[in-house]
Amino acid sequence: MTAHGNHDHADDVTGETDRRHLAIALGLIVAFMAVEVGVAVLANSLALLSDAAHMLTDAGALALSLVALRLAARPAAGAMTFGLKRAEILSAQANGAALVVLAGIIVFEAIRRLVDPPGVDGWAVVVTALAGIAVNLVATWELAKANRRNMAVEGSFQHIVTDLYAFIGTAVAGAIVLVTGFDRADPLASIGVAALMLYAAYGLLRKSGRILLEAAPAGLRVDEIGGAIAEHQHVANVHDLHVWEIATGFPALSAHVLVHAGDDCHAIRRELETMLERRFGIDHTTLQVDHAVADQPLQISRAPDADRSV
């Protein structure tokens, strides 16, 4: 119990630090977004407006992540036997979905402007984009100091980094408009921004989806874990082996282990738990250890396709 208490205290300290970094980044993003919307309208720049729209999703992602971190920090109670730890996963799913929707809107408007390009104020675009690069660098630096293994933090980080790249593309587009008068550079830059959004969304949805579908954590092979359990000299049979992730950095395992008649089930269970924690980093285990019937062959069985990539 002491180890779990220390672990919970460390999580509380880390969570508070993460919330502070997120709050600072949120303040920067909201302040600059308000300025950028005004400049985008005056300059008639879709690239700037798409950046501002992306910053709106950044702000939403940061706010959602703050709420998710607060909820995830709540202790288990009542029917919520694991607490609300998966709030961070739902936050990542929402962030990924928002990126997909926004990318679609931007591409639609960009195509319309490619067909009939309006005039663009190149100077306003370049200056605002350079300021946006500076703001996003600071916000990225803040979030880089937070715990990016947390899916809520990682979702916000991906939003900010994508926005940083978008501002770089917008600055280049503005410079092209200034030098060549090629107004279509602005919507073309917007399509590039949308592509970055979709790439970031794919990563978020895939990682968070694996957790929601209770796939084995990345880097852990179920067959290897089952083999490690079966290697124990007193183990006769391993089945119903399941490995999943309750939340980011919270792997769990359950299995039914049969040992030879006369062996100490409790001692073997403790040895297996220690091995799983030291070798695979799994400290939340539920092992049912019983005696095997005579002459039962060694086998490892689990849910089909447990190692299939998601």
Segments the model singles out, each with a brief description of its role:
Residues T2-T17, A47, A53, L64-L71, ...:
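Alpha-helical transmembrane segments and adjacent TM-loop junctions that form the membrane-embedded core
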Residues E16-R20, V41:
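Residue-level marker of regulatory loop/turn positions in helix-turn-helix DNA-binding domains and
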Residues L22-G38, V135-V138:
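First transmembrane helix
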Residues V37-L49:
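Short, hydrophobic transmembrane alpha-helix segments
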Residues T57:
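Residue-level recognition of phosphate/Mg2+-coordinating polar/acidic sites
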